[in-house]
Amino acid sequence: MKTWENHQIDGINRMPARAHFLTFPSKEKALLNNNRYTHAFKNLNGVWKFMFLDAPEYSPEGFFNSDFDVTKMDDITVPGNWQLQGYGKMHYSDLWYNFPINPPYVPTENPTGIYKRTFFVEESYRDKKIIIRFCGVDSAYHLWINGKEVGYSKVARNESEFDITDLIRVGEENDVTVRVYQWSDGTYLEDQDMWWESGIFRDVELIGVPKDGINDYKVIADLDDEYKNGIFKVEAFLRTTKEVNVTFELVDAGENTVFTKTVVAKEGKACIDEVIADVNHWTAETPYLYKLFMTVEDDGRIIEVIPQNVGFRNIRLNGETFLVNGVAIKFKGVNRHDYSPQNGRVVSREEIEKDIILMKQFNINAIRTSHYPNSYYLYDLCDEYGMYLIAETDLECHGFELTGDYKWITDDPSWELAYVSRMTRMIERDKNHPAIIFWSLGNESAFGCNFRKMTDVAHEMDPTRLVHYEGDFDVESADVYSTMYTWIENPKKPYLMKDIIEKSKKPHIHCEYCHAMGNGPGNLKDYQDLVYAHDKLQGGFVWEWFDHGIESFTESGEKYYRYGGDFGDDPSNKDFCIDGLIMPDRTPSPGLYEYKKVIEPITTTAIDIQKGIINLLSRYDFANLDRFNLVYKVMEDDVILQTGFMAVPSIEARANKDITLPYDLSVIKVKPGAHYYVNISYQLREDTSYASSGHELATAQFELPLYKEGIMVRPEGILNVEKEHTTLHVKGANFSLDFNLVNGNLMNIVRDGMQVLSKGPRLTLWRAPISNDMEIIDKLKKVYFLHLEHEVVMNIDYHMEGNILKVEVDTINSTTNSAWHFKTKYVYTVCPSGDILIDVEGTPSGRVDLAPDMLPRIGVSMHLDKSMEHVRYFGMGPGENYADSKEAAQMGLYANTVDGLFTNYVIPQENGNHMGCKWVSMTNDRGMGLLASTEGDFNFSASWYEDKDLDDAKHTCDLVKRDYIVFNVDYKQNALGTNSCGQWQLDKYRAKFEDFKLSFRLTPFNNKEVLDKHLAAERICLDK
């Protein structure tokens, strides 16, 4: 049997797994905690020689020898994935294996990479134990040093170390050869939802450590039952049985020694078990870290010093909740892969730190390391910045679900070692990180005897943490009840959130929810409201953090991102990897801004907004709200009338308090048609590790009880109306427009010789599909044909009422082959001033029983002159917003451009909607343009693209701007949902086949003659 097809071989000559740490010759250097100051450390990253083969058997004779001719080998960068460096084939799938399922066997044609390089070993390594460490190799490999075979390892995202002391020539050049196999028996356990990428993708390190030093250690920093004193235990395991002295010194954040003790190692082990009085606690909100220094001495000579961050916290079950430091915390988390758009799974510490900082800035407090141990940098950073971790085993065998025997290997005892060793190696590497709250057994691999064994071993190895596994549906072994994408409402689903609330006897975690694919996710607030309302619901992890697009360029140099199927990979789940809260270049999506708002640390409620009395409710689990300042602004449209600054008073976690904002509404002279709001911003009072003082973490907005009806304007002047064949010409003093008397359309509007509108409003029920329409798009297109719209004119009438023209158009609006339809009535009231009052009213008719249960939109679409790209509007902004994704938006007066309104999703789709709009102006550089306004409110969007353009385009580079602007005014836009994997649009947010009336006014104008907001405040009086 081939080594790489033997699931009962965990490794050959690999060292036992241990914690990842650095060792230093002195405390002074240990304080710097940088590998440059260790005893001996060499990073073997860089350019290696490389040979790509179709199978291991094609390896040339003697390829591992030191004298092998490498001149004909290619260069390759380590760390790196060979597919992104021109070898093999990129392939993305969510669950399919890329070969026949016949465990443990893999294809004979097994892409293989031979890596070679030389390296000089300095004198600093002499008399040291020399270890070579591979932090990540996909999927399995053999290792040779100086032509001698060292061993074999697998499990792509686990570290592996080999003792090569006896093979290294100190003071000379040495060489290393690694033969990597794309497929191994381990691949059956590495079927995660991600790109299949191979090679040496994490750091390779050459480490020299003292032979009498510490090989491994375990730190337990717990709390007593009163959560007051620290339970501090350390076990250090040495490489020697000599009775050396080991000093354990614990230093606080102020560099004060709080504990020190020296013990004599016995039989290769040194231990302490102490109580530290009145310790500071570690939490994600208050990540207080002590520093432990372990110093090994022999006869007064320092052998080594090892630094280790220590955080005291306690984790325990308490009936239907789990507690951290006695509190039933709420996870406000994300699932995170290691990912780079340029380098795939090769990520730097700097990239990871940017992620953590961004998460903290957006109120995220937890990460699930989906679905494998992430780069070790992540864990240090989560300890330091404050981020709870569910640390997940590199284990998923999702593809077996399609065989009808999901438990095929999960319930096969012969695979026990393969399952358990993956978890034990993870626990050993990461056991000393306070950020880790749960060990997770893996993902989407059914349940069976091997998971039972994993649970038992995890509890035995680490009784201080809890065990998570979503696949344990009956919560037979896991400590918490974990689910994915549990729906809030759906009569066809057997188990909803309400069932968890009513029936579950264990804490609940939503390990994946609110699938963030494309424009979305929706329903975030609905889920979070449930979490806040029920103790047993302890939050969840949005799927997921990144869009996993691969950075690419067109021939002209335009950047875009490729996804599944773009490399000829088949089968592929296509754009299912484009499902993150941030885009591939780490730009926050509108969904991330929405999530930030939904999980913000302060909930603000108006008690008496006229008097400025509001209530502040802390959503923190531990921190006090006195870390914030409050800035308020009383707004009149875009004008700040009053502003103030105050320190948020002391409010303990989860407590609330009324405060009064000292504004005075009595002095405000209310203007006709103006809108008044108070905007509240909660900002960090002091600099933190993740943001500067002044960074905003929470907001609130309340409409003020100030309003005066807009100025009534009676139309004056004369209209010239003339019928010419099928066209009705209308002229005023400085404008003209035409109606088509065949289809009833408003054909154009001209102001001072400039055509501001080239196609008038026409009812549309369609919008470009969003990624979250994935499960219903075929039904929308192939059953209801909603993208194939038809308007049949039943009657057109026009007449004068004094100096005002009324045009009435009755239509039937529906789609191809549909027996349901709207009876629609357009009423245009054209005034001599140039104002056009438009009412569009629809009534469901025909076979209403055959109509869809929701519509993409109900609104009208127009074409405007391409020069009118400057946008001002009073409505919800600044980002796009939809019925189930609008918490981050505030009412206000915003200025933008058509380009600026466009959200550049990796896969073009519906975007840029704004709800609650009172008016919108579209103008050119000279101020000439068109105003749309209403006494109620409407949705609007403006784009360079028709819905068909967005629907047809597969990438952003496929989009070609139209020579006009598409301007939409909608009665209702459908919600977003998360139905790419989860809850569809909730009933209360849907656009339905229902009676509707959309009323608005179009006014051609010059913004330099009259300001848009003043024009919008006018009310047209038609009374005689």
Ranges and model annotations:
Residues 1-42, 49:
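N-terminal pre-domain segments of enzymes
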Residues 3, 8-11, 34-35, 49-53, ...:
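Accessory beta-strand-rich segments of carbohydrate-active enzymes
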Residues 36-60, 77-78, 83-85, 196-199, ...:
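Substrate-binding clefts and catalytic carboxylate motifs of secreted carbohydrate-active enzymes
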Residues 80-134, 138-145, 151-154, 210-220, ...:
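Active-site-adjacent substrate/metal-binding segments within catalytic domains
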Residues 81-84, 89, 96-105, 154, ...:
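An acidic-aromatic loop/edge-strand motif
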Residues 84-85, 136, 182, 283, ...:
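Beta-strand/loop-rich accessory regions of lumenal/periplasmic or secreted enzymes
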Residues 145, 229-264, 270-272, 292, ...:
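Beta-strand-rich binding/interaction modules
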Residues 356-359, 366-581, 590:
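Substrate-binding/catalytic cleft of secreted carbohydrate-active enzymes
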